[in-house]
A protein has these predicted regions:
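Non-catalytic cap/lid and distal C-terminal segments of serine-dependent acyl enzymes
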Residues: 1-112
Length: 112
């Protein structure tokens, strides 16, 4: 997940997201992965508390630089038995991709 990369970025010198920025946005990078900024933590807390968890729609372009971390989160959701729908297609993290998948996601949300 992106949160794992952000936690690492805050620890690296000369990173595109220096530790000061990570601290300003997320708090202590050493505690980030165990914090409520991590969707995995939030999901597990909600599940353990017996809360009704939201259904999740995921769409990602196979050429998107975030494809790998999206696959990681997808596998996490599968392992947790989450109620989610996943699809991918040709595209990157651009409006060309989202113009196709946003309406599909909204339609899925309204039906589910």
């Amino acid at each position: 997940m992106v949160i794992h990369e952000v936690a690492e970025l805050g620890k690296r010198r000369n990173s595109i997201m220096p530790e000061a920025m990570v601290r300003d946005v997320f708090g202590d990078p050493e505690k980030l992965l165990g914090s409520d900024y991590n969707p995995e933590v939030l999901y597990r807390k909600g599940k353990a508390a017996g809360k009704t968890l939201p259904k999740i729609y995921m769409a990602i372009g196979r050429e998107d630089s975030l494809y790998g971390v999206n696959q990681d989160f997808r596998h996490f959701l599968e392992a947790e038995g989450a109620n989610f729908f996943y699809e991918d297609g040709h595209g990157m993290h651009t409006w060309d991709f989202w113009n196709e998948y946003l309406p599909r996601g909204l339609e899925w949300t309204l039906k589910n």
